[in-house]
Amino acid sequence: MTGASRGIGRGIARRLGKAGYDLTISAREGTRLQQAAEELSDITGGSVHPVAADMTAEKDVSRLVRAHDERHGRLDVLVLGAGVGFSAPLAQTSKRRYDLQFDVNVRAAFVLVQEALPLLRKTAAGRPEHGAKVIALASITGLFAEPDLAVYGATKAALISLCQSVNAEASDDGVSATAICPGYVDTDMTAWVRDRIEPRRMIRVDDIVEMALAVTKLSPCAVVPDITVTRPGRQLGRA
Ligand SMILES: NC(=O)c1ccc[n+]([C@@H]2O[C@H](COP(=O)([O-])OP(=O)(O)OC[C@H]3O[C@@H](n4cnc5c(N)ncnc54)[C@H](OP(=O)(O)O)[C@@H]3O)[C@@H](O)[C@H]2O)c1
């Protein structure tokens, strides 16, 4: 899984490890990734393999899939967790930030799915009662536009669409994909908004972890293309 060193990804990795999954975890920053791997293997007792990789570098993305395949030869759950977001009015968004968000949030996810699909199909064929899953951390901004998050929202809309394409092409073979679409979750990523939204009013990492875990338990007869998780009251449907 990508984006596993912090935040939501780390929470999902912890829970999957406790559920008995062997894990390949990835992020860019090696020291923090190594610490996450040590903490995860202490908690779970299972195999945890850290692979430092930058999702803007295609060779890193391919190396990540290869490293997992060589070690395990199967892939039950691919979690697309790595993501970046920058807030700016549409008119003032730089092309550099546009490219970075699309590279990490969409291109890397596409390449990961493309390269992992044969392994996911093989795993699903060998375990037809469970199948194999792709879980993408998308965003509510991919469903409803949010001021100042035009590019981020567009990347997450593309990720939701990528999950739908996986379902269209591979769910008959037991490989299904779910895009989880939350509003603001209390992590490092939302530090910039804490002055106007208190962390206690944000969705909890554990709320998203529960959704991800539920998806892993579904039979291949049930495809859940997306799950929207919104904050309550006046914030319904908003980030
Ligand atoms: N927090 C929210 O409110 C929220 C809401 C909706 C959706 N999401 C989505 O959920 C996912 C996780 O968000 P989070 O809040 O947990 O974020 P976070 O705490 O900022 O963690 C982001 C993770 O992605 C990794 N990452 C970032 N850029 C990367 C790159 N270029 N290559 C490889 N790894 C990279 C980070 O590790 P390194 O920095 O070491 O690379 C880290 O492990 C993201 O896709 C985000 O868009 C978050």
Task: Report each predicted region and the residues it spans.
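Substrate-binding pocket helix/loop in short-chain dehydrogenase/reductase
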Residues: 89-90, 94-99
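Conserved glycine-rich cofactor-binding loop
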Residues: 5-7
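Residue(s) in the substrate-gating loop at a strand-loop-helix junction
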Residues: 139
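Active-site loop immediately N-terminal to the catalytic Tyr-X3-Lys motif
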Residues: 91, 144-150, 201
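Active-site helix of classical SDR
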Residues: 113, 155
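Conserved glycine-rich Rossmann-like NAD(P)H-binding loop of the short-chain dehydrogenase/reductase
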Residues: 19-36
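C-terminal helical subdomain
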Residues: 172, 179-180, 187, 195-237
